[in-house]
Amino acid sequence: MFKRVHLIVLDSVGIGEAPDAEKFGDVGSDTLGHIAKEAGLTIPHLEKLGLGTIAPLTGVKAVADHDGYATKLEEISVGKDTMTGHWEIMGLNIKKPFRVFPNGFPEELLKQIEDFSGRKVVCNKPYSGTAVIDDYGEHQMKTGDLIVYTSADPVLQIAAHEDIIPLEELYKICQYVRDITKDEPYMIGRIIARPYVGEPGNFTRTSNRHDYALDPFGHTVLDSLKENGNDVIAVGKINDIFNGQGITEAIRTKSNMDGVDQLLTVMNKEFTGLSFTNLVDFDALYGHRRDVKGYAKAIEDFDGRLPEIMAAMAEDDLLLITADHGNDPTFPGTDHTREYVPLLAYSKKMTKQGSLPQGFYSDISATIAENFEVPATENGQSFLNQLQ
């Protein structure tokens, strides 16, 4: 039994095509494998935790007597997005996919937004959040139109200048869009208000961003932990992904390295339960942008922080490192890839080591539930008794 579990999701760090990759157009994808081959990876601490034993990675040693336990996990849900991956890690099987809109949103949805808001919509395509205000910000100021855009994730974002559209009005419009896109035919995971300020050529997004997410489609192990008096400390995007459900404390982060800093602060305080950290830069800055070298450096930077994380662990802490999907930066397009994800498990009190049987994302939730003696979901098999 562990008093605390520290679960770190390396967002999009997949480890080879999943058995159903063909359904997603992702045959041949391999985030870690292709990064190792094309850019090289110097990751001695992840090696020592057994990463190289899960699948062959060019230049990464398969350390037979590694610390802790290693395996790979398969996703059973129908999506390959962030919310689906995290929700499955916490015990849900998502049977309806969230939708992405690589060609923009349908005209009928835009018309509903225009009719409700009394404002026109511009852009309506995937765009970087900073580039979209550079390109459309001045037009928005002159016309009062709504800048509606998306990304490779199932999100609809609305940008508006705070001096042109008051925050309350922007929030009201986003709430309306949230209400009409929860179900088929849209199934959009998040609506995001993206206010900005400044003058043409010098626009900046403000901290008044607001996310309109969805509650998970069922009871997760986070809910079980919270209901039974355990701490559930969310670091990074986790609170947004679960819409606050099952979370007892939420900490925002600015980057991967800030995320590690925040996690270390959490680890150095007294609590019983789960710390749940998402490190998003792998996905947001390097995966979608197909930046192989940047992705490799980000993995190496995380590897360099692992000794600090392990030093901060108490004797009865368990560290779990995994991912939520793939995002192979060598693959065509800009979207996530359907892949296995790694699982590394380490505790200072382990007296043995080795590989765990290959499993499923929700095995993590089943293991955490068994450890804290709280109800699990119907999905997943606990590997707790194999961590010796």
Curated annotation (Swiss-Prot):
Q: Spell out the Gene3D superfamilies in the cross-references.
A: Alkaline Phosphatase, subunit A, Phosphopentomutase
Gene Ontology CC annotation, any one? cytosol
Gene name of this polypeptide: deoB
Name recorded for this polypeptide:
Phosphopentomutase
> Cellular location of this protein?
Cytoplasm
Query: Record's SUPFAM superfamilies?
Result: Alkaline phosphatase-like, DeoB insert domain-like
This enzyme catalyses: 2-deoxy-alpha-D-ribose 1-phosphate = 2-deoxy-D-ribose 5-phosphate; alpha-D-ribose 1-phosphate = D-ribose 5-phosphate
Signal peptide extent: none
